[in-house]
Design a protein with these regions (language model features):
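Two-metal-ion RNase H-like nuclease active-site motif
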Residues: 47-57
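Short, basic, glycine/proline-bearing loop/turn elements
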Residues: 15, 19-22, 87-91, 122-128
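C-terminal binding/interaction regions
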Residues: 2-37, 41-43, 111, 164-252
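Flexible, glycine/proline-enriched loop segments at strand-loop-helix junctions
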Residues: 90-95, 126-133, 205-211
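A glycine-rich, hydrophobic loop/mini-helix early in the fold
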Residues: 58-117
Length: 252
């Protein structure tokens, strides 16, 4: 865990991170009541959707955030945007939103400036929404601050309550062991966290869909199904490819 400030001791670093966690914890608590997950507040019909992702230069705090916008009907790419940045905020598990959301919001500003006619009605983020220990992952954080309907799609299980990768794989094996099947995942109180989606037919390669903001889980699932060719849905896959291509150039 690293907090990039010059000349600080290890003790100072720990103190700063504790202060950061306390501040971010309070902000997440304040954000949760603002999340809309029981109704769709999406402009209809959907014309454009987008994927957001971020990649890092190895052993560096340099990063590239990317946004790829698609025509929803044809799934053709209509715009690509990227932003080179330096992320000086420490990565702390469970608080990823505070590191990535400001950059994603800046990308939205760039998009509105350069191609406002292509504004996406729904955004897919590589990460989690309400599937989060405090029900406020990156997709929810971004959604509330941007006001744009969005949901998260993650390749990794975020442990909440007693949910683990092994328990999810067992659940998928029992109830959704074939390609394009999914199961609803709930927390200890019976609240829905999201879907574990068996895209490829291998339970070990499932992805995890959760509501971010202004969208229901059912609608998020429908959109995911309509834009997915491989394990990773196309908007996020293309955003990832774009950011990695730029990172590769920066690394040379």
């Amino acid at each position: 865990m690293k907090f990039y400030l010059n000349g600080q001791s290890k003790f100072d670093e720990i103190k700063l991170n504790i202060m950061l966690i306390k501040s971010e914890f309070r902000e997440q608590e304040d954000l949760v009541p603002l999340i809309i997950s029981d109704v769709d507040e999406i402009v209809d019909p959907i014309e454009y959707i987008a994927g957001l992702d971020i990649s890092f230069v190895k052993d560096s705090n340099q990063a590239v955030a990317s946004m790829v916008i698609f025509d929803y009907k044809t799934l053709e790419i209509v715009a690509k945007l990227s932003l080179n940045c330096v992320l000086n905020i420490a990565y702390i598990p469970g608080y990823l939103a505070f590191r990535e959301t400001p950059v994603f919001l800046k990308l939205i500003e760039i998009q509105k400036c350069h191609c406002p006619h292509l504004s996406p009605q729904v955004i897919l983020i590589d990460g989690n929404g309400v599937w989060h220990p405090r029900r406020a992952g990156s997709a929810s954080h971004f959604g509330v601050l941007s006001g744009i309907p969005c949901f998260g799609v993650s390749k990794n299980v975020l442990y909440v309550d007693n949910i683990t990768r092994e328990s999810i794989q067992q659940l998928l094996t029992e109830k959704a062991n074939e390609k394009d099947q999914f199961v609803e995942v709930k927390d200890n109180h019976g609240n829905t966290l999201g879907l574990a989606y068996n895209v490829t037919g291998s339970v070990k390669s499932a992805v995890y869909i959760s509501v971010g903001h202004k969208i229901t889980l059912a609608t998020a699932c429908q959109i995911f199904q309509s834009v997915t060719k491989y394990r990773i849905c196309e908007p996020i896959r293309q955003a990832d490819l774009l950011s990695r291509q730029i990172v590769d150039k920066l690394s040379k």
